[in-house]
Amino acid sequence: MMSKQEFLGALYNGLSGLPKEDIENSVQFYSEMIDDRMDEGMTENEALEDIGSVNEIIQQILSESSLPKLVKRTVSTSDFVTHTYTVEDDFTNIIIEDAESNINFYKSNDDKCRVLCDEREKVTHTVVNENNTLTVRVKDERNWFERINIGFFIADMRVSVYLPKNKYDSLNAASMSGDIDVANEFTFDNAKVGSISGDVSVKADVKQELNISSTSGDVYAENLNLEKFNAESTSGDVIINNISATECINASSVSGEIDLSNVKGKEIFANTISGGVMLADTVASQKLKANSTSGEIDLKRCDAKNIVLDTVSGEISGTLLSNKQFITETTSGTVNVPQCISNEECRITTVSGDIYIKIADQ
């Protein structure tokens, strides 16, 4: 049975002949369908079974994908204007939802909140402060065919949020095709930041839980001390630097690379299907698990009480900080690991890849 990530990856690859935006919208749609079923109490496997065969879904989407011929046009900065919305009252929660704008957060220099939105014909925004929550949403009144930008040059539109305080309770920011950048001047208790085709970068301090995601863009986070952290991308890279979590750290991608550097946590999981996994100075107090189907796994000065490394055709190599009881399995690869006696276990499995592990400073 496929996992959710494998299902979305197969869907993404199966629709490769369609426009990029159509692919990403389809992937996002089915991702939300799976999540909705799991919210209703289904397991991941039950949700996937209820949705149906990914191959049948691909064929259905392809059969319905005929589009009218479009007239080529150019959208430049002269086609939109920047409107400034001033927010008078205080708030502690922030919700930003847009379709194609880049979203950026800045510290206000005059203790006032302002939201600057690039807008054009039929594309405006609503900015509301209610129930202690600042909500910014795009209002797109275009017809569906006006939103398809095949072969066009599209200038970047922006939503710039200037915040007067450094500390807020929650942040929820989402864009369809824009990049999202959360600067390091701010602190949130919880944050959820995601884009379908844009890159996502979070440098702000998050105290409890941070979730960042992108379907085809890269996701990046650094300099965090928090409880839980989750980062995922379908075809983009996941890059995590200088992060410490008291609970779980999870990084996943279907075809992108996973790069963790100076990462500490109780449990750390790095999972990709066709990309590589690179872990440097990554230490879990309990469990460290990394797996890739066809990519390599490379470790530099990593450690945990329990380590699980798994590939099908990729090589597994690197250095650990302390002795382990090594349990290795490979069908056709070469195995070279230290002969150690330890109560801590490192289990390494590959089908056709080689295994080369050393203990640092030995």
Language-model region placement:
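Intrinsically disordered, low-complexity terminal regions
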Residues: 1-362
